[in-house]
């Protein structure tokens, strides 16, 4: 689950991090009032969406009057912002953050942290190249990124934060200020189950003080059950409609750009299914894992979800019966096809627990369902049916 910039800044500020002042506005009048309240020579109006690249897409504007703040806010709110991180439809802008005048600054730095799966620990990354995409820095000048891995038994040590401060070229009081900032960020990361933390840029102001000009936070969705206050910050308008609906039924769904819908039990088998569809010349329309403990209701909902995508021209169902019984899946498929007006070819491959009984149920259903003998056969049949 991702947070908006204003939510991330509020959370980080509660842990003692110095953040750029800002006021949230939902319309032009509120933006104009926010400009007056901030009282600077100019302000920055930022569209609040769950996507990077806002500046290049026109979602971040410098304004020099209350009238301009109102005009920019009204031009953004109610529209969809398309960036390099969104699809062609973009993300809806429901509010803007009117931020204080902070420039000129001495320099812009970068500070971020992720859960590093290779070391199974939290790893901080810092760079003197702030204000640009860290991926670009990593690709072109990786030597300018400094990394610190945190031992979970002892936590982030002040000496580690000081070492990063030295590498960033900070001096005197700035070092202690940075140590406080980094240790606060670590505490926030652990206590709120962050998956991603990023401040870009971390500005060194003209007076030498540090300030978080932007804030990006991703929360581990698996931990939301123990983070009720964080869960309340979820903005469902920023999520894919079908992915959101899938989460309500505990289905793992990711929309793709192909035309062959996939329903599979198990993430590994789902990825293998997409691979073989590609190998046979097809394009998967989605990743959909109904899980090892799939129920009849979940399979019906999964089928509905796939067919809601108008680009789907065929469906491949690939089930390995281990925990789940193939006959139960077959009954659910028959129920779903009868309930929904299915006018695309459906190929079903069942293996494992009660697979023969499941195939019998499908064959005796009287519906236009094609059985497959093995994954290779299933992929060939669905690709041929879609291309027919």
From Swiss-Prot:
The catalytic activity, as recorded, is: succinate + ATP + CoA = succinyl-CoA + ADP + phosphate; GTP + succinate + CoA = succinyl-CoA + GDP + phosphate
Binding of substrate, residues = 265, 322-324
The positions making up the signal sequence are none
Q: Name any cofactors this protein relies on.
A: Mg(2+)
The cofactor note from the UniProt entry for this protein is: Binds 1 Mg(2+) ion per subunit.
One of the GO BP terms on file: succinyl-CoA metabolic process
Q: Which GO terms describe its molecular function?
A: ATP binding; magnesium ion binding; succinate-CoA ligase (ADP-forming) activity; succinate-CoA ligase (GDP-forming) activity
Listed pathway(s): Carbohydrate metabolism; tricarboxylic acid cycle; succinate from succinyl-CoA (ligase route): step 1/1
* Enzyme Commission code(s) on record: 6.2.1.5
Task: List, alphabetically, the GO terms of the cellular component aspect.
Answer: cytosol; succinate-CoA ligase complex
Q: Which residues bind ATP?
A: 46, 53-55, 100, 103, 108
Q: What class of enzyme is it?
A: ligase
A Pfam family for this UniProt protein?
A: Ligase_CoA
ATP-grasp domain sequence ranges: 9-245
Q: Which UniProt keywords apply?
A: ATP-binding, Ligase, Magnesium, Metal-binding, Nucleotide-binding, Tricarboxylic acid cycle
Q: Which residues bind Mg(2+)?
A: 200, 214
InterPro entries referenced in this protein's UniProt entry, alphabetically: ATP-grasp (IPR011761), ATP-grasp_succ-CoA_synth-type (IPR013650), ATP_grasp_subdomain_1 (IPR013815), Succ-CoA_synthase_bsu_CS (IPR017866), SUCC_ACL_C (IPR005811), Succ_CoA_ligase-like_bsu (IPR005809), Succinyl-CoA_synth-like (IPR016102)
> Which family does the record assign?
Belongs to the succinate/malate CoA ligase beta subunit family.
Function as written in the Swiss-Prot or TrEMBL entry? Succinyl-CoA synthetase functions in the citric acid cycle (TCA), coupling the hydrolysis of succinyl-CoA to the synthesis of either ATP or GTP and thus represents the only step of substrate-level phosphorylation in the TCA. The beta subunit provides nucleotide specificity of the enzyme and binds the substrate succinate, while the binding sites for coenzyme A and phosphate are found in the alpha subunit.
NCBIfam families associated with the record: PRK00696.1 (NF001913), sucCoAbeta (TIGR01016)
Q: Which HAMAP family match?
A: Succ_CoA_beta (MF_00558)
**Subunit field text:** Heterotetramer of two alpha and two beta subunits.
What this protein is called in its record is Succinate--CoA ligase [ADP-forming] subunit beta
